[in-house]
């Protein structure tokens, strides 16, 4: 294998007994057992137990001086462990190495965090000493898993006819989305490049250039605040674009890739079969309170507005009477039919800034089924029974209610649905459930600016007859706000993996879409001139999507923070503690770039 080793620390088995081998790696753990020294040697591939006998005086003396994380190379004979010392939890647990010679390749200082074991350590220490953190078993395994997933994606995409192309890292600033990371130009004073938020325009230009099927494991850069599932700096996505396709064609191409990928790395979990479930956006909001529903949770919300209209529960009845847009949504809670659970959910809702969470729980009383709680008392037995019948509830079940204008209350209702499902143990644990969210609204009403605006992606093709679309004006507001687009998200277990769309490749339709949203033609030409100009020279119908690599790896690794699947992440303040970035630069460098740093103004103290 090399002059340092004949085998790795993860490959030796009983079949190697009697062989003389060379290994190299890190001292993982050291133990003294009555004269013999035992050392677990670790490398990228696993652990092997080394045995040092005092009869081998030179090697033994050297072993006595070893400390954790020293790097050593050894030579010795593979011997079988005795029956009582076999370690069934270790792939190499049937053997050990009787060391005859050893060389210390590198020493290690006292460790700021342990590599052995998985203790919780402060994030700042873990990121400052990331090279040590990466030696820890779980994180090391996650990073290797990421590599395998990316390699498998590349193989699958190539096998179904996609070509991998690289797009520029230095590009123009984008007027849409998050803040750009700007790069000053030395050759063009006062002008800036931007790191790409996504290769969106480039991948569409690749379609215009006639390459038909493109993919890339694309780095994307956005100057935005961190979240558990979002880096403050860069992230990677499986960027995909296809020519001469409909929405159905895109789904048919990507579903086998994602299904096969997840099935391969699911570690025994099931993966929902394809074609994946398709849920219109409006239905997702109504049933699940979210456009990224977790379908492992069986709870489906229903409207029970009519059961409260004119009822004795004045809080809801009053809201319904005042505003025709108000709805009351019911969140069934199978098995949650006791006052303690209902009160706990009510307290949770108050902690979320809500006045509370109305509920009814059902119980058998004297052989009869009855609803209990303040809501049931106020609306009476007839309405209570109608709600129970509609939702199919039985004794021992409960139902919670959220009332208001859906646009304002849907998000909280979705949180309550998730909370109920989690608290009652209703969520399936051993499955990856995919779905598509389709039929997103093309436009929405911007209440702050009192105007029609784009709802999501301004470059999507409207799901509307194009000849009629070109004739629309602001007098057709209801028609415009009811229009959907060929936009879609793919969701797995409540995690949005990707947005995508069939693109608007027709300049006249694009001009019209921006006009409806209040943008002048000149603005479109200034901001998107490169792509728009290309569309004037024969553009095929095209569409695509871009599932996030980080989020897919997080799901498959079973972790909730992307720092557990990213090799060198930034912290929450967008700092790289290991490399000490961002940092100040030399005045000479700023001068070459024609830049002067102006310190931020200090805020005036009040009073």
From Swiss-Prot:
GO molecular function terms listed in the Swiss-Prot or TrEMBL record: aspartate-tRNA ligase activity; aspartate-tRNA(Asn) ligase activity; ATP binding; nucleic acid binding
The UniProt record lists the keyword Metal-binding: no
InterPro entries listed in its UniProt record: Aa-tRNA-synt_II (IPR004364), aa-tRNA-synth_II (IPR006195), aa-tRNA-synth_II/BPL/LPL (IPR045864), Asp-tRNA-ligase_1 (IPR004524), Asp-tRNA-ligase_1_N (IPR047089), Asp/Asn-tRNA-synth_IIb (IPR002312), AspRS_core (IPR047090), GAD-like_sf (IPR004115)
Record has Plastid as a keyword: no
Alphabetic keyword roster: Aminoacyl-tRNA synthetase, ATP-binding, Cytoplasm, Ligase, Nucleotide-binding, Protein biosynthesis
Gene Ontology biological process terms, A to Z: aspartyl-tRNA aminoacylation
Subcellular location: Cytoplasm
Region named Aspartate: 200-203
Domain of life: Bacteria
Pfam families per UniProt: GAD (PF02938), tRNA-synt_2 (PF00152), tRNA_anti-codon (PF01336)
EC number: 6.1.1.23
Amino acids binding L-aspartate: 176, 222, 456, 503
Site (Important for tRNA non-discrimination): 33
Annotated GO CC locations: cytoplasm
Positions of disulphide bridges: none
Reaction(s) the record says it catalyses: tRNA(Asx) + L-aspartate + ATP = L-aspartyl-tRNA(Asx) + AMP + diphosphate
Chain positions recorded as ATP binding sites: 222-224, 496, 548-551
Subunit and interaction comment: Homodimer.
Matching NCBIfam families: aspS_bact, PRK00476.1
Family: Belongs to the class-II aminoacyl-tRNA synthetase family. Type 1 subfamily.
Function: Aspartyl-tRNA synthetase with relaxed tRNA specificity since it is able to aspartylate not only its cognate tRNA(Asp) but also tRNA(Asn). Reaction proceeds in two steps: L-aspartate is first activated by ATP to form Asp-AMP and then transferred to the acceptor end of tRNA(Asp/Asn).
Xref: PANTHER family: ASPARTATE--TRNA LIGASE, MITOCHONDRIAL, ASPARTYL/LYSYL-TRNA SYNTHETASE
Protein name as annotated: Aspartate--tRNA(Asp/Asn) ligase
Natural source organism: Parvibaculum lavamentivorans (strain DS-1 / DSM 13023 / NCIMB 13966)
